[in-house]
C-alpha cells in the first residue's frame, strides 16, 4: 500500500512503517482499479452493493457538519449554470459525503476510490443532460432528507433505487461492450 513507509535521511534515519490512513487505502484501491483496468460495470455493481449501506449508516451516524456538506453538494448539483465538470465534481462530493457521514473508515476509503473511477468513466456530456441532472438532484435531496431524518430504511432504499437507476441509464446510453476505467478513450 502506498504511503505506509516514511523514509528519513540522516543519523536517526531509516525506513519507518506508518499507520495506514483512509487516504492510503483509497489510493491503493484506486491503483488496483486503474492497474487492473477494472470495467465500469464492475465498479457500478460494487457501488450498488456499498452505497445503500453507506446511506443507512449515514442516517444513523450523521452529524450536523455532515448534513452541511451534503446540502452544499446538493446546491452545487442543482446549479443550472454548472458545466459538466462542475456537476460531476459536486455529484462525486455528495456520494463521498454520504460515505463520510457513515463514519465507517473502510466504506469511506472504498467510496473515494470507486467514485474517482466512476467519475472517469461517466464524464460524458451526451449522457449527463438536463434530465439526468434533474433526476440526480431530486434523488439526492430525497436521500439527504432521509439521512437528516435518521430514517436508515428510507435512506438505504432511496440510495439503492438511485444507484441502480443510474447504472441502468448509463448502460442504455453506452452500448459498448465495456468501458474500462483508466483507458485513454474515457478521459483518463
What are the language-model segments listed below?
Residues 36-37, 123-126:
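Short alpha-helical transmembrane interface motifs in multi-pass membrane proteins
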Residues 131-133:
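Hinge/beta->alpha junction and helix N-cap segments in small-molecule ligand-binding domains
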Residues 43-124, 136-145, 154-169:
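Conserved amphipathic alpha-helical segments that form helical-bundle/coiled-coil interaction surfaces
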Residues 1-50, 56, 60, 175-188:
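Short linear motifs at protein or domain termini
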Amino acid at each position: 500500500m502506498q504511503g505506509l513507509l516514511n523514509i528519513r535521511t540522516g543519523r536517526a534515519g531509516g525506513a519507518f512503517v506508518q499507520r495506514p490512513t483512509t487516504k492510503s487505502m483509497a489510493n491503493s484501491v484506486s491503483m488496483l482499479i486503474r492497474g487492473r483496468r477494472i470495467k465500469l460495470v464492475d465498479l457500478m455493481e460494487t457501488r450498488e452493493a456499498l452505497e445503500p449501506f453507506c446511506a443507512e449508516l449515514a442516517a444513523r451516524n450523521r452529524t450536523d457538519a455532515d448534513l452541511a456538506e451534503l446540502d452544499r453538494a446538493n446546491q452545487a448539483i442543482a446549479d443550472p449554470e454548472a458545466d459538466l465538470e462542475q456537476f460531476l465534481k459536486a455529484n462525486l462530493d455528495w456520494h463521498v459525503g454520504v460515505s463520510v457521514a457513515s463514519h465507517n473508515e473502510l466504506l469511506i476509503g472504498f467510496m473515494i476510490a470507486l467514485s474517482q473511477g466512476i467519475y472517469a468513466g461517466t464524464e460524458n456530456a451526451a449522457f449527463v443532460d438536463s434530465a439526468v441532472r434533474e433526476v440526480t438532484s431530486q434523488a439526492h435531496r430525497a436521500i439527504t432528507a432521509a439521512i437528516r431524518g435518521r430514517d436508515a430504511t428510507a435512506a438505504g432504499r432511496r440510495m439503492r433505487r438511485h444507484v441502480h437507476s443510474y447504472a441502468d441509464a448509463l448502460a442504455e446510453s453506452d452500448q459498448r461492450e465495456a468501458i474500462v476505467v483508466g483507458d485513454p478513450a474515457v478521459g483518463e
